[in-house]
Amino acid sequence: MAKKVTGYLKLQVPAGAANPSPPIGPALGQRGLNIMEFCKAFNAQTQKEEKNTPIPVVITIYADRSFTFEMKTPPMSFFLKQAAKIQSGSKLPGRDSAGKVTSAQVREIAEKKMKDLNCDSIESAMRMVEGSARSMGLQVEG
């Protein structure tokens, strides 16, 4: 028989930087999970990632206080900011431009994010990336 799931916990943790301090420690501790076990496992799995890359993680919590976790790809905004070489998006998207991304960069981001997006074709994934870029105040060229 499968373990009984008692809940899910979604966190965004920098790659290789999981530690028991807030926000990770309190979020796991109040659910009775072993904080250090998660930190060691997460850091081991994110060793190959670039340091401080934000990694969304979904932790499945079971009734016996054990857990499993699934890592997603970094947020689209992270990839867009890297491609445009900016620190943050525009405060007034649509009016002020924060930077530019090319169609090739959009395609590359769509290919990286494809497994986490709810679409079938690369073209629809590219449209999602372009929409995110526009909402950040980035112009898509090409």
Swiss-Prot record:
The gene is rplK. One of its GO terms (biological process) is translation. NCBIfam families: L11_bact (TIGR01632). Part of the ribosomal stalk of the 50S ribosomal subunit. Interacts with L10 and the large rRNA to form the base of the stalk. L10 forms an elongated spine to which L12 dimers bind in a sequential fashion forming a multimeric L10(L12)X complex. Disulfide bonds: none annotated. Belongs to the universal ribosomal protein uL11 family. One or more lysine residues are methylated. PROSITE patterns: RIBOSOMAL_L11. Forms part of the ribosomal stalk which helps the ribosome interact with GTP-bound translation factors. This is Large ribosomal subunit protein uL11.
